[in-house]
Amino acid sequence: MIKVFGLLHKRSDISQTKFHSHWKGPHAVHAIKLVPVMRRYVQNHKATTAYPGMEPPCDGSPEVWLQSLEGGGTLNTMPDYINGAFIDEPNFMRVRSSGIAVSENIIIEGPPIGKKDKLTKVLYFLKRNPALTSEQFREQWLAHEGALLVGQNNLRRFVRSPTLPETYVDGDAPYDGVEEVWWNNKADFDKDKKSGGAHKAELRLLLDTKATTAMFVDENRVVWPGLSDDKD
């Protein structure tokens, strides 16, 4: 399954509250019309709690599941997109936004997540050490057993998604991969943050630690197929 992470920045003349309200409300209505090309769609809203010691990459990150990259091209030419979400974007966000296409690798499945479940989630947008090629980074990262920046004794779900090679065709990608980590609550995150992930020496070899970013996010699961609105 292919996923696309967008990197949205609010318009400079509107508040964070208005940005998140418009994206979650009127804009989400447009997105629902893009099924079935868009298999799932989650809005990752930057939470008010800042991630300790790291900058956020954006104000929000739409997460879209597609059957293929070609599906993404189809989505961008659909009349429902052109006459709906596309026209609405300047109402709340800075255009045009950037993003990356990734392949989803579920490391720890965890219990099913219902559409309305409230969890603690962090998105880690990873930038490789400039000494590594994208292929070298991908190989070394995928060989690492756990999450890079936190322990995993208390986490609920862990997904590791490397940026697709096709993303590099026109030059370097904004990020080389994403780690998504969920916990049942903030206290469980605090425990895993304290225990740490990879050794600092390993992180320096693998990552550009200054360009790697992270943020707590509040998930709005807009398109989340399942048996009901409350089941995965």
Report residues per predicted region.
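Macromolecular interaction modules
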Residues: 1-232
